[in-house]
Amino acid sequence: MKTLYSLRRFYHVETLFNGTLALAGRDQETTGFAWWAGNARLINLSGKLLGAHVAHAGLIVFWAGAMNLFEVAHFVPEKPMYEQGLILLPHLATLGWGVGPGGEVIDTFPYFVSGVLHLISSAVLGFGGIYHALLGPETLEESFPFFGYVWKDRNKMTTILGIHLILLGIGAFLLVLKALYFGGVYDTWAPGGGDVRKITNLTLSPSVIFGYSLKSPFGGEGWIVSVDDLEDIIGGHVWLGSICILGGIWHILTKPFAWARRAFVWSGEAYLSYSLGALSVFGFIACCFVWFNNTAYPSEFYGPTGPEASQAQAFTFLVRDQRLGANVGSAQGPTGLGKYLMRSPTGEVIFGGETMRFWDLRAPWLEPLRGPNGLDLSRLKKDIQPWQERRSAEYMTHAPLGSLNSVGGVATEINAVNYVSPRSWLATSHFVLGFFLFVGHLWHAGRARAAAAGFEKGIDRDFEPVLSMTPLN
């Protein structure tokens, strides 16, 4: 075997393949990893690993900018965003850019600016990635000790953790600043059907903010996904940003306690597994958030939630039949329950029919018709506004159901449109990615624990067919 780069930092895992097909310092013999193991070859080359990460960030930001401009180029202002397969413009609109009352897009220029800024940023990151991958120092420890590290240096690792937490905290505060001072954000609950507004009266009460995390995840409780006013969302970001920044300072200033040193595995692969586990949890939470929450993800941009489309259908036919003379308060359905209205298990008046299972739904077009005991019969008879009828008819025909061939909406709904809701795309993609990340977490956690215990030597490759084959070059 050739001289190892550094015995002290050699990762003892054998993955033989074809040692001839690699660059010096990044080949199988010096790193213990073959070419197909990707960045595992760079575990102990901090400079090259930096290049890989910066280049990866460049690819991510390039996608964001290019996809952003693609969506702007294809955008039709006359159609709702959710009918156009957009997944980036709804996020920009939710932040209050380019939209007015009712979520109507009045200016697409901010979206264009966002795309261009991301493209320019990606060029800078791409250059930095190529520089550090090809030209920069292989390791940072000698020339730039502040940026250098040894994976098992616990103090340095928690310092890096602290820096990352501070950056996340600053990110949370950027949303707070946008909502408070820089034009506000889109509030789907604004009177008359949603508008952009500045958030003035933040919720900072810890009992309210942390009350969400103590709620049950089931039914009408809905854990943090049940948040339904912007004051709570922005106030939550103040708390979260503060906790991240204070926690970051704490981790920079302190060394890990003895119990933490014993509890964790301190290696690069262990940190990878922790990160994948955290991202997996984020993916599953994001899946539930975008599927059920119509405040952080306004229905004007993302389309209605499943329960919302269902309740909208019940409301639309209640309106129609009431105009045709039906007494919606007492009409009986085929099961003997109320055809249009019935009572929930706890006594509230709710919509009847199959949509009874979604009786928890809260939506801006429906809440004005509720009284202290659920839906108010007198309001349903006298107070329904045209915008509520229009919006519910629109949502009824745009349920977030759909197949890959884009035959969207409820299969039995004759007025449904060919489309797949962005809610479907975002929820399913985040669920699948969350699952893959969880599998990756288990895989790398198992390898890291085995390596720490000293019995990870990879697969026995003495009889691997590839060893008897001619080298590729």
From Swiss-Prot:
Residues carrying Phosphothreonine: 15
Keywords: Acetylation, Chlorophyll, Chloroplast, Chromophore, Manganese, Membrane, Metal-binding, Phosphoprotein, Photosynthesis, Photosystem II, Plastid, Thylakoid, Transmembrane, Transmembrane helix
Cofactor note: Binds multiple chlorophylls and provides some of the ligands for the Ca-4Mn-5O cluster of the oxygen-evolving complex. It may also provide a ligand for a Cl- that is required for oxygen evolution. PSII binds additional chlorophylls, carotenoids and specific lipids.
GO molecular function, one term: electron transporter, transferring electrons within the cyclic electron transport pathway of photosynthesis activity
Transmembrane segments: 69-93, 134-155, 178-200, 255-275, 291-312, 447-471
Family affiliation: Belongs to the PsbB/PsbC family. PsbC subfamily.
NCBIfam families (UniProt xref): psbC
Name listed for the protein in its UniProt record: Photosystem II CP43 reaction center protein
